[in-house]
Amino acid sequence: MLRIINTQINMSTDWILRVGDGENLRRSSKYKIWGIQTITSPHGKHFIKNVKHGDRLWFVKSKSQGLVLAVATYVSHNKREFGPLLNITMTNEELGWTGDGIDWTSDIEVHYTDLYNLTQCQLLTHIKGASTIRKYDDKCKVELPVEYNYILRYSKITLEL
């Protein structure tokens, strides 16, 4: 039984998601929802096509040498739906998100669980580039899969950031 569980953990993919200054993530963390753009972002499209249940989502602050704010476990995603009379999904206002511009608006909700607040850990990925979502690779200065094992061992799941 232990061998099967260990195999499942090792098959998880680590995804790095840039979250601006982190304030929108902090405000919506109580709902366990993050938003991504797939209409104009090839990185968002790639993520939606390849992410799977149990993958790890590393939320990283922009323009901070890649400061890791939190890690969570991916559960699912869905298209955000707003109607003239009734909204099927939560609005930006309900989630506490602020911002403007077409590139800012998220068309997909990403649902996660097991959120760990890492704001005090000073984990710096040092990843550069314009990509808002990417798979973990050797360009990352922190071995995220190794760190995740320590996080599981020494941290507690948080209800929100």
List each language-model region with its residue ranges.
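Short, flexible beta-strand-to-coil junctions
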Residues: 19-23, 60-65
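Short catalytic/ligand-binding loop motif for oxyanion handling, primarily in non-cytosolic enzymes
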Residues: 66-68, 81-82
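Short loop/helix-cap segments at secondary-structure boundaries that form the rim of catalytic
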Residues: 27
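Contiguous surface segments at macromolecular interaction interfaces
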Residues: 2-24, 33-46, 80-161
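Dinucleotide-binding Rossmann-like beta1-alpha1 core, especially the glycine-rich loop
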Residues: 30
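Short connector loops at helix/strand junctions that flank enzyme active sites
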Residues: 52-54, 67-69, 103-107
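Short beta-strand-centered aromatic/proline hotspots
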Residues: 68-77
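Short coil-to-beta transition motif at edge beta-strands of beta-rich domains
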Residues: 48-61
